[in-house]
């Protein structure tokens, strides 16, 4: 029997960049050139054209999704006689997933900026799952420092409790803060999330699930709390190149600070630094991508596929 999948059976509809750009229609551009520059991540590229052709159509799509979800929630509240939520509001949660160095943070920040300009969703918060990593002291004790960013390196129960409280409409809900400068969770430092209209959750493994239990008991996954999810995709060799580029730039900037966790790398020669970056990529990040991140790609509602120039070349939207 031929096991090849008929393209017509794919759960996704694929758009070229030009086809996707046409879906913007009359969605207004609400970001200026200076703001776009501020939203751009280190070693990422974000242009006005990218916002117009990729993110404005996505903004329009999400506007429809959020509106439909809010309408359904109001109908359910009436059906249940408003017993579930006294204020008639439930945050819409968007997950953003993808590899290290793919540009997740830039995408999340652009979406936050665009969605916050909708008249019906003025409050949009952004939380990264980095804050839910186990502290370095715990990772070292458990022998997991080489697995940082892998599923087992997160305080999953804390993350699930955070998302449960958000969906339940509790206020305010606190999330731990992470410092890339110190490469650790910041003790006793939290960010408050106070009943946003939309919450964007960005992280490596946010779409991951596990094996269902044999006893049939319900086990929640992070993605169970998402109303919509985006996966940022790129080829492995492209991701490797971007990661090394970013490492080399950090070597000349943040790593030079004596207080930086990675200060030792600033003293390497250029060749030594490049070899170190490649070693970290292959030993940790590529392994995590292949074993844990990439297998979750097909669980996303939308896949943004990037080319080597950091621009989105193709969009895949899950069929309803």
Swiss-Prot record:
User: Any idea which positions bind ATP?
Assistant: 98-105
Against InterPro entries, the record matches this protein to: P-loop_NTPase, PanK, PRK/URK
- What Pfam families is this protein classified in? PRK
Gene Ontology CC annotation, any one: cytoplasm
Residues in the signal sequence: none
Q: Which UniProt keywords apply?
A: ATP-binding, Coenzyme A biosynthesis, Cytoplasm, Kinase, Nucleotide-binding, Transferase
- Subcellular location(s) per record: Cytoplasm
Does Membrane show up as a keyword for this record?
no
Q: Which reaction does it catalyse?
A: (R)-pantothenate + ATP = (R)-4'-phosphopantothenate + ADP + H(+)
Which pathway does the database say it acts in?
A: Cofactor biosynthesis; coenzyme A biosynthesis; CoA from (R)-pantothenate: step 1/5
Q: Which GO terms describe its molecular function?
A: ATP binding; pantothenate kinase activity
**Listed transmembrane segments:** none
Look up the coiled coil feature and give its residue ranges: none
User: What GO terms describe the biological role, i.e. biological process, of this protein?
Assistant: coenzyme A biosynthetic process
Q: Provide the E.C. number(s) assigned to this enzyme.
A: 2.7.1.33
Q: Which HAMAP family match?
A: Pantothen_kinase_1
Identify its protein family.
Answer: Belongs to the prokaryotic pantothenate kinase family.
Identification of the protein by name: Pantothenate kinase
The encoding gene is coaA
């Amino acid at each position: 029997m031929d096991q090849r999948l008929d393209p017509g059976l794919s759960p996704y509809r694929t758009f070229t960049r030009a086809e996707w750009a046409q879906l913007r229609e009359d969605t207004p551009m609400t970001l200026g050139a200076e703001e776009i520059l501020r939203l751009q991540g280190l070693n990422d590229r974000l242009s006005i054209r990218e916002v117009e052709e990729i993110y404005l159509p996505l903004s329009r799509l999400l506007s429809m999704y959020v509106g439909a979800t809010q309408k359904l929630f109001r109908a359910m509240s009436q059906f249940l006689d408003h017993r579930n939520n006294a204020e008639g509001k439930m945050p819409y949660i968007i997950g953003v997933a993808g590899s290290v160095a793919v540009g997740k943070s830039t995408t999340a920040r652009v979406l936050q900026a665009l969605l916050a300009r909708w008249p019906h969703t003025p409050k949009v918060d952004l939380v990264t799952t980095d804050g839910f990593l186990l502290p370095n002291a715990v990772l070292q004790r458990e022998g997991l420092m080489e697995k940082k960013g892998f599923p087992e390196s997160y305080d999953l129960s804390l993350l699930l409790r955070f998302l449960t409280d958000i969906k339940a409409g509790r206020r305010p809900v606190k999330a731990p803060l992470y410092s890339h400068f110190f490469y650790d969770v910041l003790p006793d430092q939290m960010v408050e999330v106070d009943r946003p209209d939309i919450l964007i959750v960005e992280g490596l493994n946010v779409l991951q699930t596990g094996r269902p239990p044999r006893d049939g008991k319900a086990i929640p996954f992070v993605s169970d709390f998402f109303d919509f999810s985006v996966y940022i995709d790129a080829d492995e060799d492209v991701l490797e190149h971007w990661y090394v580029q970013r490492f080399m730039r950090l070597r000349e900037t943040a790593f030079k600070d004596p207080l930086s966790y990675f200060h030792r790398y600033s003293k390497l020669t250029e060749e030594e630094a490049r070899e170190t970056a490649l070693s970290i990529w292959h030993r940790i990040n590529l392994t995590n991508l292949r074993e844990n991140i990439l297998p979750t790609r097909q669980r996303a509602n939308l896949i943004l596929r990037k080319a080597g120039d950091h621009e989105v070349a193709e969009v895949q939207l899950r069929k309803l």
